[in-house]
């Protein structure tokens, strides 16, 4: 899955949620706001956004951070949301009964969400640079 010339500044930690009962379009609207943010900043943004997609995404970020802490012993304060993907999952097909024996089709979409966190070392990393954004400063790769 990963290329041989991976120049990431630290280890990657991933968490995957499959078959989440929401459309991928609605999840992408939330995901685009937290891409590139630090762990604490991403959770703060998700708490304040008024969308239903924020709850499963914040659970997934908590899970990825817990994986980083438990499996690799990393500090949660040094984590960065480096890559986030939302893919469409299977569509559940249902039928809404209507008058005179008819049935209208109902499609219930699902999505798969992948979150990759990276550890950043802010003191001696020439690959990272500070970038000013509306919500404060964010560490990004050059």
Swiss-Prot record:
Predominant location category: plastid
Subcellular location: Plastid, Chloroplast
Taxonomic superkingdom: Eukaryota
Gene Ontology MF terms: rRNA binding; structural constituent of ribosome
Key word rRNA-binding present: yes
Cellular component, GO, one term: large ribosomal subunit
Any GO BP annotation: translation
Keywords for this protein: Chloroplast, Plastid, Ribonucleoprotein, Ribosomal protein, RNA-binding, rRNA-binding
InterPro entries per UniProt: Ribosomal_uL22, Ribosomal_uL22_bac/chlpt-type, Ribosomal_uL22_bac/org-type, Ribosomal_uL22_CS, Ribosomal_uL22_sf
Annotated function: This protein binds specifically to 23S rRNA.
Family named by the database record: Belongs to the universal ribosomal protein uL22 family.
Subunit structure: Part of the 50S ribosomal subunit.
NCBIfam families on file: rplV_bact
Protein name per its UniProtKB record: Large ribosomal subunit protein uL22c
Classification lineage: Eukaryota, Viridiplantae, Streptophyta, Embryophyta, Tracheophyta
